[in-house]
Amino acid sequence: MDVMMFVLWFAVGFVFGSVPSGLWLVKAIHGIDIREYGSKNIGSTNVFRTVGGKTAVLVLLCDAGKGIIAVMIAQSMTGGDLYAMLFAAIGALLGHNYSLFLGFKGGRGVATGLGLLIFLMPKVSGICFIVWLAIVLATRYVSLGSCVGAFCAPCLAWYFGYPLPVFLFAAVA
């Protein structure tokens, strides 16, 4: 695969990742700009704290789903080329964090990263979720659970023998 194809898959991922699900869903359902409330973040944690669980679950699913969709498109169009999928994944994550629709501002990438982990490394994502849940239940800090879960991802990717590019993605995502 040539360099232009990597750029293409990165761009596809970036556009999908740029969709500000939290902002648009909260605006559509509740008529408010979520960036004016709580932590001012558009992610599901701030949505949960500001407008409640139902909308937060929708935001979480959309943020996770947009990364998965970008990678699935790359997978189906390239016959499963791992590098195309990873470039789409990196694009989706960076698009979420630096959204085209929000002047290159965005979320923290936790839900989008989770969706990418679920698709690319299902065993790893399941264990990371259990670790995240245990930390959140024990401390009531979602951010701490997210950080510990993110730290576990590359360790588990290495342990389960995922290919080096997937391990590196887990390490930097």
Identify the residue ranges that each predicted region occupies.
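Nucleotide and nucleotide-moiety/phosphate-recognizing core
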Residues: 5, 9, 55-61, 66-101, ...
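C-terminal ends of transmembrane helices
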Residues: 22-27, 95-105, 132-139
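Short, non-helical or kinked segments that cap or interrupt transmembrane helices
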Residues: 32-43, 101-114, 141-149
